[in-house]
């Protein structure tokens, strides 16, 4: 087997398996609630319609396309053909397949349908509404008009059934004009057309305005009753309507005007006017005028997006340099109608109506003609809006309105076959299924992170820019997307309607209650793939994984420090705010010049009696008595140092924090001579006895008298105290500060021993 063929088969098989499994499918076609997953590349390769649709909607975020087509089987069979190259055609589905292929512009399916029609006799095609007209020539005209630039001419030339015209009864000749009242002479007079069909594609104009006309006729074909089809031809007035009703008794393919407007049947005369030789122009002219009038019907808007109307007038003028009178009139009418559509001029429309002659006015007087025939300016009206009956929101398409109504009714017809969750739209179900399969086709171009939905990528990109356009009205906090803002606003509400069944705790959000219940159950379904540690919430797992990867996505704008959690970053930013608010006060105090009054105030405000309060308990041991010289010597070496330590450790009761801040700089800024010359003070008891041991009671009295003297001396300001020399000469026994502290500790120890 050819390696290229093997390679192609393998590629096609893999694409088909991916479509069946729903993997890597980047679009979804929704037809009457039925979802068809597919690949855009495959659809664009086979369908010119999808190629233009995808190219013109490249900026579209949604990958779900709603096709309002009545028959679902036609879409499904064409998709199967794209992925398998097999198409099952029979007399029952040939009409559906031909209609759908014409709408979607699938050239391969059109070729197969035409081949099937060529091989099948006209009498064996019950699905066709008009056996004579459609089977003989309309197929060729359809193929020529819709896809004339790509369709091979030989297949078009062989479309008519060979030799049926001599055997066609007279009723067939009457039936053909009923469905196609612009071509009665071609069926009844084959000699006028030369008796051969190969000339038809040669003289048939290959302009895109005819394809536009094909879609334009669908609105009329759906709304108009078959019995109300105009029958202006005098020789075929009543028999045509009767035969048409019999022909339309077979079930046609119904359609609605939507994104894709599927016709009930596709006779060629609703596509374009027929082509004749110049032999019978006088008979063909009055009967060829109504199609020019039909071209003023509703236009399919999506064809304008495909640029099919861009250069139709110029191409029409250069295509046939020598047209006959009937063709010239039809082309002139079409050109005038296009000018009216583009410029909105009604004067040109009236002029074109006048050139159509009496047959045009007779056609307008027909009973049952739709309003679009009588009012040519209807095509220029804005597109119809479909408003919701409950909230009044307008929509351009009825299918979008139906989807919107589900938000009011709560209907969720789409169910996940894995977890059973229901959704109101098929696109939401598709995004949900990706979470089960793990497929993440959307990638962030900045960091490379992958997402399952396109909307998640758009919300993620805002994180890199740091933009938070959605602000809370209550607290002013900003959010990158509106959904997070809605969740945040619930935290400000006092209503707590979600209550835990086990502990009775209430919450204002459902997700908080679900997270709280995990604490009761102890369930930890989220495990770390690196270390195996389990967590109760997915957010906890994400934060834990950052400890392995080292990712710190939250950075401070002030110092550029990065953090793994947003809460830590918020606390860090508060530190910058406190420092900025406190720094001016401290710097102002330090920069203020030092005044002498500050020094005096600081000295007078500090009192040793206010700082230290010593309570001594009775002791049962003898206290050691030291001479005055040793006491004074010990005090001179330690008194000033211990006093400075106590002063720095203790604070006066009435001093505030601000006063302390204002005093400390002044202490630091004292002159060197004040700090280098500490004054020494000696303390002793009032009794003049020295060096004599006293009884236990006498020792206790000495200690108490010494403490009383110390307390009296500490009440004096430092500046008014006498020098220590006076105490050295007049006082005898003295207890240093360390001795007093030791005495107090010993007293407490003895008291504890007595209690034991």
From Swiss-Prot:
Organism annotation: Mus musculus
Gene Ontology biological process terms, A to Z: negative regulation of cell population proliferation; positive regulation of transcription by RNA polymerase II; regulation of cell cycle
Gene Ontology cellular component list: cytoplasm; cytosol; microtubule cytoskeleton; nucleoplasm; nucleus
Role noted for this protein: Transcription factor. Inhibits cell proliferation by activating either CDKN1A/p21 transcription or RB1 transcription.
Tissue expression pattern: Widely expressed, with highest levels in white adipose tissue and kidney, intermediate levels in brain, liver and heart, and lowest levels in spleen, brown adipose tissue and muscle.
Name listed for the protein in its UniProt record: Zinc finger and BTB domain-containing protein 49
UniProt biased composition (Polar residues): 226-242
Stored InterPro entries: BTB/POZ_dom (IPR000210), SKP1/BTB/POZ_sf (IPR011333), Znf_C2H2_sf (IPR036236), Znf_C2H2_type (IPR013087), ZnFinger_BTB_dom_contain (IPR050457)
Family: Belongs to the krueppel C2H2-type zinc-finger protein family.
Keywords (A to Z) from UniProt: Activator, Cell cycle, Cytoplasm, DNA-binding, Metal-binding, Nucleus, Repeat, Transcription, Transcription regulation, Zinc, Zinc-finger
Assembly description: Interacts with EP300, KAT5/Tip60 and ZBTB17. The interaction with EP300 is direct and leads to synergistic induction of CDKN1A. On the CDKN1A promoter, forms a complex with ZBTB17; this interaction leads to additive CDKN1A transactivation. The interaction with ZBTB17 may block ZBTB17 repressor activity.
Chief localisation class: cytoplasm
Short name of one Pfam family: BTB
Taxonomic superkingdom: Eukaryota
Residue ranges, annotated region (Disordered): 176-197, 226-290, 311-379
């Amino acid at each position: 087997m050819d390696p290229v063929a093997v390679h192609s088969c393998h590629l096609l098989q893999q694409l088909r398996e991916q479509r069946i499994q729903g993997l890597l499918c980047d679009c979804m076609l929704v037809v009457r609630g039925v979802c068809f997953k597919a690949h855009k590349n495959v659809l664009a390769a086979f369908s010119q319609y999808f190629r233009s649709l995808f190219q013109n909607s490249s900026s579209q975020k949604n990958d779900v396309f709603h096709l309002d087509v009545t028959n679902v089987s036609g879409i499904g069979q064409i998709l199967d053909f794209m992925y398998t190259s097999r198409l099952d055609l029979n007399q029952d589905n040939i009409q559906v397949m031909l209609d759908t292929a014409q709408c979607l512009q699938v050239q391969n399916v059109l070729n197969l349908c035409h081949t099937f029609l060529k091989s099948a006799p006209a009498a064996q095609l019950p699905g066709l509404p008009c056996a004579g007209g459609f089977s003989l020539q309309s197929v060729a005209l359809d193929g020529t008009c819709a896809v004339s630039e790509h369709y091979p001419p030989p297949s078009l030339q062989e479309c008519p059934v060979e030799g049926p015209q001599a055997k066609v009864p007279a009723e067939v000749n009457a039936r053909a004009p009923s469905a196609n009242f612009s071509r009665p002479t071609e069926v009844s007079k084959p000699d006028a057309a030369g008796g051969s069909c190969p000339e038809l594609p040669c003289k048939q104009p290959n302009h895109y305005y005819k394809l536009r006309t094909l879609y334009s006729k669908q609105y009329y074909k759906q709304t108009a009753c078959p019995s109300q089809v105009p029958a202006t031809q005098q020789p075929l007035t009543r028999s045509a309507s009767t035969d048409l009703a019999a022909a339309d008794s077979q079930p046609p393919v119904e359609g609605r005007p939507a994104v894709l407007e599927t016709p009930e049947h596709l006779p060629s005369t609703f596509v374009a006017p027929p082509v004749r030789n110049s032999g019978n122009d006088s008979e063909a002219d009055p009967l060829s005028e109504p199609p020019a009038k039909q071209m003023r019907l509703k236009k399919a808007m999506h064809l304008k997006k495909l640029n099919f109307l861009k250069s139709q007038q110029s191409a029409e003028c250069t295509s046939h340099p020598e047209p006959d009178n009937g063709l010239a009139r039809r082309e002139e009418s079409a050109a005038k109608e296009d000018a009216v559509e583009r410029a909105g001029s009604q004067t040109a429309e009236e002029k074109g109506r006048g050139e159509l002659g009496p047959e045009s006015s007779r056609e307008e007087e027909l009973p049952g003609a739709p309003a679009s025939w009588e009012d040519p300016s209807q095509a220029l009206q804005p597109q119809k809006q479909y408003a919701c009956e409950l909230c009044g929101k307008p929509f351009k398409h009825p299918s979008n309105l139906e989807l919107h109504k589900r938000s009011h009714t709560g209907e969720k017809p789409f169910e996940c076959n894995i977890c059973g969750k229901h959704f109101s739209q098929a696109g939401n179900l598709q995004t949900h299924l990706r979470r089960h399969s793990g497929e993440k086709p959307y990638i962030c171009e900045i960091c490379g992170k992958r997402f399952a939905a396109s909307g998640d990528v758009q919300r993620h990109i805002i994180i890199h820019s740091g933009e938070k356009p959605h602000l809370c009205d209550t607290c002013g906090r900003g959010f990158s997307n509106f959904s997070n803002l809605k969740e945040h606003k619930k935290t400000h509400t006092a209503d707590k309607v979600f209550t835990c069944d086990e502990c009775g705790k209430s919450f204002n959000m459902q997700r908080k209650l679900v997270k709280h219940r995990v604490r009761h159950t102890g369930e930890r379904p989220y495990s770390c793939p690196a270390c195996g540690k389990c967590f109760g919430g997915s957010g906890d797992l994400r934060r834990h994984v950052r400890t392995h990867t080292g990712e710190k996505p939250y950075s401070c704008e002030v110092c550029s420090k990065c953090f793994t959690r947003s809460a830590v970053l918020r606390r860090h930013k508060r530190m910058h705010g406190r420092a900025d608010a406190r720094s001016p006060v401290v710097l102002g105090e330090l920069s203020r010049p030092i005044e002498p009054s500050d020094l005096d105030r600081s000295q007078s405000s500090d009192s040793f009696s206010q700082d230290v309060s010593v309570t001594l308990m009775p002791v049962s041991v003898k206290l050691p008595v030291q001479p005055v010289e040793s006491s004074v010597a010990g005090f001179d070496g330690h008194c000033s140092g211990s006093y400075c330590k106590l002063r720095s450790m203790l604070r006066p009761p009435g001093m505030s924090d601000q006063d302390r801040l204002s005093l400390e700089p002044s202490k630091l800024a004292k002159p060197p001579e004040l700090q280098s010359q500490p004054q020494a003070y000696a303390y002793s008891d009032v009794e003049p006895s020295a060096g004599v041991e006293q009884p236990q009671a006498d020792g206790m009295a000495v200690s108490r008298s010494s403490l009383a003297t110390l307390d009296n001396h500490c009440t004096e300001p430092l500046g008014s105290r006498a020098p220590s020399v006076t105490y050295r000469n007049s006082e005898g026994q003295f207890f240093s500060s360390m001795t007093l502290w030791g005495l107090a500790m010993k007293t407490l120890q003895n008291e504890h021993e007595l209690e034991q």
